[in-house]
Amino acid sequence: MKKNQFLKESDVTAESVFFMKRRQVLKALGISAAAFSLPHAAHADLLSWFKGNDRPPAPAGKPLEFSKPAAWQNNLPLTPADKVSGYNNFYEFGLDKADPAANAGSLKTDPWTLKISGEVAKPLTLDHDDLTRRFPLEERIYRMRCVEAWSMVVPWIGFPLHKLLALAEPTSNAKYVAFETIYAPEQMPGQQDRFIGGGLKYPYVEGLRLDEAMHPLTLMTVGVYGKALPPQNGAPVRLIVPWKYGFKGIKSIVSIKLTRERPPTTWNLVAPDEYGFYANVNPHVDHPRWSQATERFIGSGGILDVQRQPTLLFNGYADQVASLYRGLDLRENF
Protein backbone atom coordinates (compact mmCIF):
# COMPACT_ATOMS: atom_id res chain seq x y z
CA MET A 1 0.00 0.00 0.00
CA LYS A 2 1.32 3.42 -0.93
CA LYS A 3 2.28 5.88 1.75
CA ASN A 4 -0.07 8.81 2.32
CA GLN A 5 1.09 12.39 1.92
CA PHE A 6 2.63 13.78 5.10
CA LEU A 7 1.60 16.73 7.19
CA LYS A 8 4.05 19.20 8.62
CA GLU A 9 4.86 19.11 12.32
CA SER A 10 3.56 22.68 12.61
CA ASP A 11 0.11 21.58 11.43
CA VAL A 12 -0.57 19.27 14.36
CA THR A 13 -3.44 20.17 16.65
CA ALA A 14 -1.88 21.47 19.83
CA GLU A 15 -2.53 20.65 23.48
CA SER A 16 -4.71 23.64 24.29
CA VAL A 17 -7.67 25.19 22.52
CA PHE A 18 -10.62 25.79 24.84
CA PHE A 19 -8.92 28.58 26.77
CA MET A 20 -10.79 31.77 25.99
CA LYS A 21 -13.92 32.92 27.74
CA ARG A 22 -16.77 33.02 25.25
CA ARG A 23 -18.40 36.21 26.40
CA GLN A 24 -15.12 38.12 26.64
CA VAL A 25 -14.02 37.20 23.14
CA LEU A 26 -17.42 37.72 21.54
CA LYS A 27 -17.47 41.19 23.07
CA ALA A 28 -13.89 41.93 22.01
CA LEU A 29 -14.54 40.85 18.41
CA GLY A 30 -17.88 42.62 18.24
CA ILE A 31 -19.77 39.49 17.28
CA SER A 32 -23.46 40.32 17.52
CA ALA A 33 -26.49 38.17 18.09
CA ALA A 34 -27.00 38.16 14.32
CA ALA A 35 -24.15 35.68 14.03
CA PHE A 36 -26.29 33.12 15.76
CA SER A 37 -28.85 33.27 12.94
CA LEU A 38 -26.35 31.62 10.60
CA PRO A 39 -26.86 27.93 9.72
CA HIS A 40 -25.35 25.85 12.50
CA ALA A 41 -22.58 24.24 10.46
CA ALA A 42 -21.32 27.68 9.47
CA HIS A 43 -20.81 28.95 13.01
CA ALA A 44 -20.46 25.85 15.18
CA ASP A 45 -16.68 25.89 14.93
CA LEU A 46 -16.49 29.60 15.70
CA LEU A 47 -18.43 29.25 18.93
CA SER A 48 -16.40 26.25 20.00
CA TRP A 49 -13.23 28.33 20.12
CA PHE A 50 -14.63 30.28 23.05
CA LYS A 51 -14.85 27.57 25.67
CA GLY A 52 -13.49 27.93 29.16
CA ASN A 53 -10.69 25.92 30.73
CA ASP A 54 -12.87 22.91 31.54
CA ARG A 55 -11.39 20.67 28.86
CA PRO A 56 -12.55 17.05 29.01
CA PRO A 57 -9.91 14.44 29.83
CA ALA A 58 -8.33 12.15 27.26
CA PRO A 59 -10.08 8.83 26.56
CA ALA A 60 -10.27 6.62 29.64
CA GLY A 61 -11.74 3.43 28.22
CA LYS A 62 -10.35 -0.01 28.92
CA PRO A 63 -7.08 -0.92 27.16
CA LEU A 64 -7.47 -3.02 24.02
CA GLU A 65 -5.28 -5.72 22.51
CA PHE A 66 -4.38 -4.88 18.93
CA SER A 67 -1.66 -5.12 16.32
CA LYS A 68 0.01 -2.28 14.46
CA PRO A 69 0.34 -3.36 10.82
CA ALA A 70 3.13 -1.47 9.10
CA ALA A 71 0.82 -0.47 6.24
CA TRP A 72 -1.18 1.73 8.61
CA GLN A 73 1.66 3.11 10.73
CA ASN A 74 2.72 6.19 8.81
CA ASN A 75 4.50 9.45 9.55
CA LEU A 76 1.35 11.54 9.96
CA PRO A 77 1.66 13.50 13.22
CA LEU A 78 -1.18 12.64 15.58
CA THR A 79 -3.81 15.02 16.85
CA PRO A 80 -3.54 15.00 20.68
CA ALA A 81 -5.94 12.67 22.45
CA ASP A 82 -7.73 15.38 24.40
CA LYS A 83 -8.74 17.07 21.15
CA VAL A 84 -10.07 13.87 19.63
CA SER A 85 -12.14 13.20 22.75
CA GLY A 86 -13.10 16.81 23.40
CA TYR A 87 -13.88 18.34 19.99
CA ASN A 88 -16.72 16.39 18.39
CA ASN A 89 -19.88 16.50 16.34
CA PHE A 90 -22.45 14.17 17.91
CA TYR A 91 -25.73 16.07 17.87
CA GLU A 92 -27.47 13.47 19.98
CA PHE A 93 -25.58 15.10 22.87
CA GLY A 94 -25.71 18.74 21.78
CA LEU A 95 -24.60 21.10 19.03
CA ASP A 96 -21.44 22.60 20.48
CA LYS A 97 -18.15 20.78 19.96
CA ALA A 98 -17.66 20.27 23.71
CA ASP A 99 -21.23 19.06 24.36
CA PRO A 100 -20.65 15.38 23.50
CA ALA A 101 -17.80 15.06 26.01
CA ALA A 102 -19.90 16.83 28.63
CA ASN A 103 -23.12 14.88 28.03
CA ALA A 104 -22.31 11.47 26.54
CA GLY A 105 -21.63 9.84 29.90
CA SER A 106 -25.34 9.04 30.00
CA LEU A 107 -24.97 6.57 27.12
CA LYS A 108 -24.98 2.93 28.27
CA THR A 109 -22.74 0.93 25.95
CA ASP A 110 -22.75 -2.43 27.74
CA PRO A 111 -24.81 -4.47 27.08
CA TRP A 112 -24.96 -3.68 23.36
CA THR A 113 -26.46 -5.42 20.35
CA LEU A 114 -25.42 -4.94 16.72
CA LYS A 115 -27.57 -6.70 14.12
CA ILE A 116 -26.56 -7.44 10.52
CA SER A 117 -29.59 -8.17 8.36
CA GLY A 118 -31.22 -7.61 4.99
CA GLU A 119 -29.82 -9.10 1.80
CA VAL A 120 -27.58 -11.63 3.54
CA ALA A 121 -27.58 -15.41 3.69
CA LYS A 122 -26.58 -15.50 7.35
CA PRO A 123 -27.97 -12.70 9.52
CA LEU A 124 -25.79 -11.99 12.54
CA THR A 125 -26.14 -10.49 15.98
CA LEU A 126 -23.05 -9.30 17.85
CA ASP A 127 -22.91 -8.38 21.51
CA HIS A 128 -20.59 -5.95 23.28
CA ASP A 129 -17.77 -8.48 23.75
CA ASP A 130 -17.97 -9.67 20.14
CA LEU A 131 -17.04 -6.19 18.97
CA THR A 132 -13.57 -6.42 20.51
CA ARG A 133 -12.96 -10.18 20.53
CA ARG A 134 -14.48 -11.73 17.43
CA PHE A 135 -12.12 -10.05 14.98
CA PRO A 136 -8.40 -9.27 15.33
CA LEU A 137 -8.07 -5.57 16.11
CA GLU A 138 -5.50 -3.31 14.50
CA GLU A 139 -4.48 0.30 14.88
CA ARG A 140 -4.76 2.48 11.81
CA ILE A 141 -3.57 6.08 11.66
CA TYR A 142 -6.06 7.89 9.44
CA ARG A 143 -6.75 11.43 8.43
CA MET A 144 -10.18 12.64 9.51
CA ARG A 145 -11.75 15.48 7.50
CA CYS A 146 -14.94 17.18 8.66
CA VAL A 147 -17.27 18.75 6.09
CA GLU A 148 -16.88 21.96 8.14
CA ALA A 149 -13.33 22.23 6.73
CA TRP A 150 -11.35 21.17 9.81
CA SER A 151 -9.33 18.01 10.17
CA MET A 152 -7.45 15.73 12.53
CA VAL A 153 -5.13 12.72 12.37
CA VAL A 154 -6.33 9.87 14.59
CA PRO A 155 -5.01 6.40 15.57
CA TRP A 156 -8.26 4.44 15.36
CA ILE A 157 -8.51 0.81 16.47
CA GLY A 158 -10.87 -1.61 14.81
CA PHE A 159 -11.38 -4.24 12.13
CA PRO A 160 -12.23 -3.99 8.42
CA LEU A 161 -15.95 -3.91 7.78
CA HIS A 162 -15.54 -6.41 4.95
CA LYS A 163 -14.64 -9.12 7.47
CA LEU A 164 -17.95 -8.65 9.25
CA LEU A 165 -19.95 -8.52 6.03
CA ALA A 166 -18.24 -11.65 4.74
CA LEU A 167 -19.55 -13.59 7.74
CA ALA A 168 -23.08 -12.52 6.87
CA GLU A 169 -22.61 -13.56 3.22
CA PRO A 170 -24.22 -10.78 1.16
CA THR A 171 -26.57 -12.04 -1.54
CA SER A 172 -26.32 -11.06 -5.19
CA ASN A 173 -29.15 -8.59 -4.56
CA ALA A 174 -27.11 -6.55 -2.07
CA LYS A 175 -25.99 -3.26 -3.57
CA TYR A 176 -25.86 -0.93 -0.55
CA VAL A 177 -25.24 -1.02 3.18
CA ALA A 178 -27.47 0.96 5.57
CA PHE A 179 -26.33 1.90 9.08
CA GLU A 180 -28.38 3.09 12.05
CA THR A 181 -27.41 4.69 15.37
CA ILE A 182 -29.07 3.64 18.60
CA TYR A 183 -32.32 5.41 19.40
CA ALA A 184 -32.35 6.07 23.14
CA PRO A 185 -33.93 9.45 23.95
CA GLU A 186 -33.64 8.81 27.67
CA GLN A 187 -29.85 8.63 27.25
CA MET A 188 -29.37 11.06 24.37
CA PRO A 189 -30.76 14.54 25.09
CA GLY A 190 -30.55 15.58 21.44
CA GLN A 191 -32.99 12.83 20.47
CA GLN A 192 -35.37 13.98 23.17
CA ASP A 193 -35.24 17.72 22.46
CA ARG A 194 -35.17 19.04 18.89
CA PHE A 195 -33.46 22.25 20.00
CA ILE A 196 -30.59 20.35 21.61
CA GLY A 197 -30.35 17.91 18.70
CA GLY A 198 -30.36 20.43 15.87
CA GLY A 199 -33.79 19.49 14.58
CA LEU A 200 -32.57 16.27 12.97
CA LYS A 201 -34.85 13.28 12.57
CA TYR A 202 -33.50 10.45 14.71
CA PRO A 203 -32.17 7.82 14.76
CA TYR A 204 -29.21 8.97 12.67
CA VAL A 205 -28.81 6.89 9.52
CA GLU A 206 -26.04 6.54 6.95
CA GLY A 207 -25.20 4.41 3.96
CA LEU A 208 -22.51 3.23 1.57
CA ARG A 209 -22.40 1.40 -1.71
CA LEU A 210 -21.48 -2.22 -1.12
CA ASP A 211 -18.12 -1.83 -2.87
CA GLU A 212 -17.29 1.13 -0.60
CA ALA A 213 -18.23 -0.90 2.46
CA MET A 214 -16.08 -3.81 1.30
CA HIS A 215 -13.03 -1.63 0.64
CA PRO A 216 -10.06 -2.47 2.92
CA LEU A 217 -9.86 1.11 4.23
CA THR A 218 -13.41 1.04 5.65
CA LEU A 219 -13.11 0.39 9.36
CA MET A 220 -15.48 -0.73 12.08
CA THR A 221 -13.92 1.22 14.91
CA VAL A 222 -14.02 0.24 18.58
CA GLY A 223 -11.08 2.15 20.03
CA VAL A 224 -8.76 5.13 19.86
CA TYR A 225 -5.37 5.80 21.42
CA GLY A 226 -5.07 2.20 22.61
CA LYS A 227 -8.34 2.14 24.54
CA ALA A 228 -12.03 1.52 23.96
CA LEU A 229 -13.90 4.41 22.37
CA PRO A 230 -15.28 6.99 24.78
CA PRO A 231 -19.02 7.63 24.36
CA GLN A 232 -18.51 11.02 22.70
CA ASN A 233 -16.52 9.36 19.92
CA GLY A 234 -19.24 6.84 19.13
CA ALA A 235 -18.84 3.98 21.60
CA PRO A 236 -18.96 1.09 21.46
CA VAL A 237 -18.65 0.89 17.67
CA ARG A 238 -18.61 3.45 14.88
CA LEU A 239 -17.77 3.61 11.20
CA ILE A 240 -14.66 5.26 9.79
CA VAL A 241 -14.44 5.84 6.03
CA PRO A 242 -11.30 7.98 5.78
CA TRP A 243 -11.77 9.28 2.23
CA LYS A 244 -15.22 10.69 3.05
CA TYR A 245 -16.37 13.62 5.16
CA GLY A 246 -16.78 12.86 8.82
CA PHE A 247 -20.58 12.84 8.88
CA LYS A 248 -20.42 9.51 7.01
CA GLY A 249 -18.73 8.05 10.10
CA ILE A 250 -21.92 7.06 11.90
CA LYS A 251 -21.53 6.48 15.64
CA SER A 252 -22.94 4.04 18.22
CA ILE A 253 -24.21 1.64 15.55
CA VAL A 254 -26.96 -0.88 16.35
CA SER A 255 -28.00 -1.96 12.85
CA ILE A 256 -26.27 -2.78 9.57
CA LYS A 257 -28.66 -3.75 6.80
CA LEU A 258 -27.73 -4.74 3.27
CA THR A 259 -30.21 -3.41 0.73
CA ARG A 260 -31.07 -3.42 -2.96
CA GLU A 261 -31.83 0.29 -3.07
CA ARG A 262 -29.79 3.27 -1.94
CA PRO A 263 -30.67 3.96 1.69
CA PRO A 264 -31.62 7.38 3.06
CA THR A 265 -28.92 9.25 4.98
CA THR A 266 -29.58 11.85 7.66
CA TRP A 267 -27.77 14.92 6.36
CA ASN A 268 -28.79 14.26 2.77
CA LEU A 269 -32.42 14.21 3.92
CA VAL A 270 -31.95 17.51 5.75
CA ALA A 271 -30.18 19.39 2.94
CA PRO A 272 -29.63 17.36 -0.25
CA ASP A 273 -28.04 20.34 -2.03
CA GLU A 274 -25.40 20.62 0.68
CA TYR A 275 -24.70 17.04 1.80
CA GLY A 276 -24.51 14.40 -0.88
CA PHE A 277 -24.81 10.67 -0.49
CA TYR A 278 -21.21 10.06 -1.51
CA ALA A 279 -19.61 12.85 0.55
CA ASN A 280 -16.15 12.15 -0.84
CA VAL A 281 -13.55 14.69 0.26
CA ASN A 282 -12.99 16.90 -2.77
CA PRO A 283 -11.20 20.27 -2.83
CA HIS A 284 -12.85 21.06 -6.18
CA VAL A 285 -16.44 20.77 -4.95
CA ASP A 286 -17.30 23.47 -2.44
CA HIS A 287 -20.04 23.36 0.13
CA PRO A 288 -22.64 25.97 -0.94
CA ARG A 289 -21.71 28.10 2.07
CA TRP A 290 -17.93 27.65 2.30
CA SER A 291 -14.89 26.52 0.36
CA GLN A 292 -13.51 23.00 0.62
CA ALA A 293 -10.22 23.93 -1.06
CA THR A 294 -8.38 24.16 2.26
CA GLU A 295 -8.79 22.78 5.76
CA ARG A 296 -7.76 23.97 9.18
CA PHE A 297 -6.20 22.37 12.22
CA ILE A 298 -7.06 23.71 15.66
CA GLY A 299 -3.95 25.66 16.57
CA SER A 300 -2.29 26.36 19.89
CA GLY A 301 -2.62 30.14 19.82
CA GLY A 302 -6.36 30.54 19.43
CA ILE A 303 -8.73 31.51 16.67
CA LEU A 304 -6.34 34.00 15.04
CA ASP A 305 -3.55 31.44 14.75
CA VAL A 306 -5.38 28.70 12.88
CA GLN A 307 -3.15 27.05 10.29
CA ARG A 308 -4.58 26.01 6.96
CA GLN A 309 -3.40 23.46 4.43
CA PRO A 310 -4.69 22.33 1.03
CA THR A 311 -7.45 19.75 1.05
CA LEU A 312 -6.38 16.51 -0.61
CA LEU A 313 -8.64 14.73 -3.07
CA PHE A 314 -10.24 11.76 -1.30
CA ASN A 315 -8.49 13.07 1.82
CA GLY A 316 -5.15 11.78 0.59
CA TYR A 317 -6.39 8.26 -0.23
CA ALA A 318 -6.92 8.72 -3.97
CA ASP A 319 -4.40 6.01 -4.89
CA GLN A 320 -6.49 3.49 -2.98
CA VAL A 321 -10.06 4.53 -3.76
CA ALA A 322 -10.26 6.62 -6.95
CA SER A 323 -10.95 3.50 -9.01
CA LEU A 324 -14.26 3.06 -7.16
CA TYR A 325 -15.56 6.16 -8.92
CA ARG A 326 -14.15 5.72 -12.41
CA GLY A 327 -16.56 7.29 -14.89
CA LEU A 328 -18.61 8.98 -12.15
CA ASP A 329 -19.05 12.76 -12.26
CA LEU A 330 -17.75 13.77 -8.83
CA ARG A 331 -19.31 17.22 -9.05
CA GLU A 332 -22.76 15.88 -9.74
CA ASN A 333 -22.37 12.91 -7.39
CA PHE A 334 -20.90 14.79 -4.45
Curated annotation (Swiss-Prot):
For biological process, the GO terms are: protein repair
Catalytic activity line of the entry: L-methionyl-[protein] + a quinone + H2O = L-methionyl-(S)-S-oxide-[protein] + a quinol; L-methionyl-[protein] + a quinone + H2O = L-methionyl-(R)-S-oxide-[protein] + a quinol
A single GO cellular-component term on record: periplasmic space
**SUPFAM superfamilies the UniProt entry points to:** Oxidoreductase molybdopterin-binding domain
Q: Where does Mo-molybdopterin bind?
A: N88, Y91, E92, C146, T181, N233, R238, G249, I250, K251
| Main localization, broad class | periplasm
Q: How is the cofactor bound?
A: Binds 1 Mo-molybdopterin (Mo-MPT) cofactor per subunit.
Q: Where does the signal peptide begin and end? A: 1-44
Gene3D superfamilies from the UniProt entry: Oxidoreductase, molybdopterin-binding domain (3.90.420.10)
Show the GO MF annotations: metal ion binding; molybdopterin cofactor binding; oxidoreductase activity, acting on a sulfur group of donors, quinone or similar compound as acceptor
**Which Pfam families does the record cross-reference, listed alphabetically?**
Oxidored_molyb
Its EC number is 1.8.5.-
Compartment(s): Periplasm
Keywords assigned by UniProt? Answer: Metal-binding, Molybdenum, Oxidoreductase, Periplasm, Signal
Q: How is it modified after translation?
A: Predicted to be exported by the Tat system. The position of the signal peptide cleavage has not been experimentally proven.
Requisite cofactors? Mo-molybdopterin
Q: Under which main EC class is this enzyme filed?
A: oxidoreductase
Role summary: Part of the MsrPQ system that repairs oxidized periplasmic proteins containing methionine sulfoxide residues (Met-O), using respiratory chain electrons. Thus protects these proteins from oxidative-stress damage caused by reactive species of oxygen and chlorine generated by the host defense mechanisms. MsrPQ is essential for the maintenance of envelope integrity under bleach stress, rescuing a wide series of structurally unrelated periplasmic proteins from methionine oxidation, including the primary periplasmic chaperone SurA and the lipoprotein Pal.
Q: Which family does it belong to?
A: Belongs to the MsrP family.
| PANTHER family membership | PROTEIN-METHIONINE-SULFOXIDE REDUCTASE, PROTEIN-METHIONINE-SULFOXIDE REDUCTASE CATALYTIC SUBUNIT MSRP
Task: Summarize subunit and interaction data from the UniProt record for this chain.
Answer: Heterodimer of a catalytic subunit (MsrP) and a heme-binding subunit (MsrQ).
The name this protein goes by in its record: Protein-methionine-sulfoxide reductase catalytic subunit MsrP
Q: Which organism is it from?
A: Escherichia coli O6:H1 (strain CFT073 / ATCC 700928 / UPEC)
Gene for this chain: msrP
